[in-house]
Swiss-Prot record:
UniProt keyword annotation of DNA-binding present: no
One example GO MF annotation: small ribosomal subunit rRNA binding
One term under GO cellular component: cytosolic small ribosomal subunit
Subunit structure: Part of the 30S ribosomal subunit. Forms a tight heterodimer with protein bS6.
Family to which this protein belongs: Belongs to the bacterial ribosomal protein bS18 family.
Amino acid composition bias (Low complexity), ranges on this chain: 11-21
Compositional bias per record (Basic and acidic residues), positions renumbered to this chain: 1-10
Organism: Paramagnetospirillum magneticum (strain ATCC 700264 / AMB-1)
Function text: Binds as a heterodimer with protein bS6 to the central domain of the 16S rRNA, where it helps stabilize the platform of the 30S subunit.
Superkingdom: Bacteria
Keyword Cytoplasm included in the entry's annotation: no
Designated name of the protein: Small ribosomal subunit protein bS18
Residue ranges of coiled coil: none
Length: 92
């Protein structure tokens, strides 16, 4: 059997054309650290609801950019608020 190799055309940037600038992703900072940052409180439903998905799940820190320590505090506050009936467990 004879193997036939086909060469795909390369994009203009890889072929020696104009070089693309690499995409610069801005580093997110924790919304709970720094001056004037809100305190995590289980009674602050307006704040806690920003970190809950539309299905009622806790949004992960890689999306919200919350630090690991504050994410644990946030999860504990959300669970406390759910237990007291201030937040729903699931949204239908």
């Amino acid at each position: 059997m004879t193997e036939v190799k086909t060469e795909r055309p390369r994009p203009a940037a890889a072929a020696g054309g104009a070089q693309r600038r690499p995409f610069f992703r801005r580093r997110k900072t924790c919304p709970f650290s720094g001056e004037g940052a809100p305190k995590i409180d289980y009674k602050d439903i307006k704040l806690l609801s920003r970190f809950i998905s539309e299905r009622g799940k806790i949004v992960p820190s890689r999306i919200t950019a919350v630090s690991a320590k504050k994410q644990r505090e946030l999860a504990q506050a959300i669970k406390r608020a759910r237990f007291l009936g201030l937040l729903p467990y699931v949204v239908k």
